[in-house]
From Swiss-Prot:
It comes from Prochlorococcus marinus (strain NATL2A). HAMAP family: Ribosomal_uS14_1. Disulfide bonds: none annotated. GO terms for molecular function: rRNA binding; structural constituent of ribosome. This is Small ribosomal subunit protein uS14.
Amino acid sequence: MAKKSMIARDVKRKKLVERYAAKRKSLIEAFKSAKDPMERLEIHRKIQALPRNCAPNRIRNRCWATGKPRGVYRDFGLCRNQLRSRAHNGELPGVVKSSW
């Protein structure tokens, strides 16, 4: 089980990303379309003025059962340990143990 403070921090980041998504996207589009270097510099400063945690790449994929940050399978949202135990118990529909 991950520390509750780290899970809470990640939840806080997700809320910030949602809140600033439109503003961040419009600034990035304006930055890409700007030709004048001074205009680009001004837009870049506005992007830098946004909160650091509103960038989507700062969100960590976490297991929804345990909150572990590593070894998380995107398809299931589970860490490898939980995926294995739930697959063995038959709690994941369509997942069968491989045998040949």
